[in-house]
A protein has these predicted regions:
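Active-site-proximal helix-loop-helix substrate-binding element of RNase H-like nuclease domains
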Residues: 2-9, 52-185
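Long, highly charged low-complexity segments
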Residues: 1-50, 80-91
Length: 186
C-alpha cells in the first residue's frame, strides 16, 4: 500500500506583460486592483488600517490590457516599486480613469502613495444612476446586461480548487499565472 498522494494541478500559459507601456496619451484608462483584504467582510476595507495589500493591478485602454502582479504569495510577480511608479504616471495623466467601485481601488492606491488625478468614472455608481432598482451592481452582472459578456471565472476557480483555497478571498495565495487571465477581463 502506498502513502503517496498524487496531485494534478491545472497549468496556465498566461505571462505578465514584458514592459510598462506608455499609456499617458490614452483618453480612458480602466484600472482594477486585486487585493489581499482579509477582514473586509468583518471590518470593511483594509486600506485605512493597513490591513492587507494590493496583489496586482489590471490596466486596460482601447489598445492594451494587462495584469501586473506584485504580491502573489506563490510567485510570478513583477517588481513592486517599478509597477507602482508606472501606475502613478498613469494616474497623473489627463485620461479619464475608470473603476468599478472606485472608492475601494482608489483607497488602496492612496495607501500605496498613488494619487489619482483628473476625472474618475465609477461604473458601479453609473449603473445605480441608470437603474436604481437593479438587484445587483457587480461588474459581471453589468457586463451581461450592457455588453452581453460574462467574465469567465472557470480557470481561477479550478486553480483555487487545486490549491485548496477560496478563489476570491484567497486569490493572493495563487501564482499570478492563474489570476492574470481573470484579472485582465475586468
Amino acid at each position: 500500500m502506498s502513502n503517496q498522494i498524487n496531485f494534478t494541478f491545472q497549468d496556465s500559459d498566461w505571462v505578465p506583460p514584458t514592459n510598462y507601456p506608455d499609456l499617458r496619451n490614452a483618453k480612458e484608462i480602466a484600472i482594477d486592483l486585486e487585493t489581499k483584504d482579509p477582514e473586509i467582510k468583518i471590518k470593511g476595507p483594509g486600506w485605512p488600517t493597513n490591513n492587507g495589500n494590493v496583489i496586482g493591478i489590471a490596466v486596460a485602454t482601447d489598445t492594451f490590457k494587462g495584469y501586473f502582479p506584485v504580491a502573489h504569495e506563490a510567485g510570478g510577480n513583477m517588481d513592486m516599486m517599478m509597477t507602482l511608479k508606472w501606475v502613478q504616471d498613469i494616474c497623473r495623466s489627463k485620461a479619464t480613469k475608470i473603476f468599478h467601485n472606485a472608492s475601494y481601488d482608489i483607497g488602496w492606491l492612496r495607501a500605496n502613495g498613488i494619487v489619482v488625478y483628473g476625472d474618475v468614472a465609477d461604473t458601479m455608481i453609473a449603473a445605480a444612476l441608470i437603474d436604481e432598482n437593479r438587484r445587483m451592481y457587480s461588474l459581471n452582472a453589468l457586463s451581461v446586461d450592457f455588453i452581453s459578456e460574462l467574465k469567465s471565472e472557470a480557470g481561477l476557480k479550478e486553480a483555487a480548487q487545486d490549491w485548496g483555497i477560496d478563489a476570491k478571498a484567497e486569490m493572493f495565495k495563487l501564482p499570478a499565472k492563474f489570476v492574470g487571465p481573470y484579472a485582465e477581463q475586468d
